[in-house]
Amino acid sequence: MEELLSAVIIGIVLGWLCKDWLHFPNGSNLYVLITLIFFVGIQLRNNGISLKEVLLNKQGLMMGAIFTLSSLIGGVISAFFLSMPITQGLAFSSGFGWYSLSSVVLTNAWGPMQGSIAFFNDLSREILSLFLIPLFMQHYRSTAIEITGATALDCTLPIIQKSGGIEVTPIAISFGMVTNLLPPLLLVFFSSFPI
């Protein structure tokens, strides 16, 4: 836990101190992410885990379905308590941590205020999950994976793998596949209703 926190703090400080002379080419983070996922795939194969075990992992797919259902139920409950339209609560809960998608879709549909809410909501999930994964992984593996939402397939995957070992990686990838396929559909559907 201390290592992760230290890495984040050092990264923020270095980014702030070096912002004037250290510039990364646009899109370079995409190539880093693709390389990272490529090496995860090599590591899975070297440990005897097949592509079928990764993509069609029953536990990961079931977790994705339960996560989606519980997120939508949470959106309805939040809408009730915050006195907002149910479709708006459902839309806010449909981002699953994919802040770059949810903020754009909801800004285009309902304006910058709702887009900002979606951005903060989903970015908060990702930031919190970076710190919560190591805490939950020992005793609550499913919870540790599910708190990541859509980021289980990309930026939080290395932390899931480091905290839980190679055996949880197929579960996280299957879960991440579900939580990356559904947000575009759900966000567009729920945001099509006027508020």
From Swiss-Prot:
Localization of this protein: Cell inner membrane
Disulfide bonding pattern of the chain: none
Domain of life: Bacteria
Functional note: Mediates export of lysine.
InterPro entries attached to this UniProt entry: LysO
Cellular component GO terms held in the UniProt record: plasma membrane
Keywords in alphabetical order: Amino-acid transport, Cell inner membrane, Cell membrane, Membrane, Transmembrane, Transmembrane helix, Transport
Keyword Transmembrane helix tagged: yes
Residues that span the membrane, as ranges: 4-24, 30-50, 61-81, 86-106, 117-137, 170-190
Main subcellular localisation: membrane
Cited Pfam families: Lys_export
Membrane topology: Multi-pass membrane protein
Gene Ontology molecular functions: L-lysine efflux transmembrane transporter activity
Name listed for the protein in its UniProt record: Putative lysine exporter
Family: Belongs to the LysO family.
Organism in which the protein naturally occurs: Haemophilus influenzae (strain ATCC 51907 / DSM 11121 / KW20 / Rd)
